[in-house]
């Protein structure tokens, strides 16, 4: 989701940009319509443009969520051609049984949806999430506005890779923060040519 759903608090610093009440089950079909993925990307680009108008000189893209290492691993598999085993980590500390299930779900999602690794929008709409779409848009928007943007974490680096596949020149504005403990991080960072500054053992 791109908003805090049913929050009892009014907080002007939080920008709610809902694309719907969650994505669909990627193990059964596409996560969202292609036009919804495009809308998410454009929303992120708009946020970056607004930041520039507000006088912001550097952006940072991170995330807070549960379950989004699953979609990020699926997206990275599609973009990189790497096997599920190579890019999938335990996320929030899964048990062995849950970790096995996670990998099976990703395998099934890729088999059912057959995302085109040469088309990042196809990948995002089939096996991505609203968060990844918006984050990719922020990366693209930052580059368009010539703003440096910090890439923070696994989900962020996968979104950055989507952005760079849409516009190769965008990667010149990306700054790596820390090396995520998630298995696929180094693969995505290598594909981006990103060199993170810190090793903190964080996911």
Predicted segments with their positions:
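Short, small-residue-biased leader/transition segments that mark boundaries at the very start
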Residues: 2-4
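Small/polar-residue-rich loop-to-helix segments that shape phosphate-bearing ligand pockets
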Residues: 7-49, 106-121, 125-126
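Generic secondary-structure signature for well-ordered alpha-helical cores
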Residues: 42, 46-53, 78-85, 104-115, ...
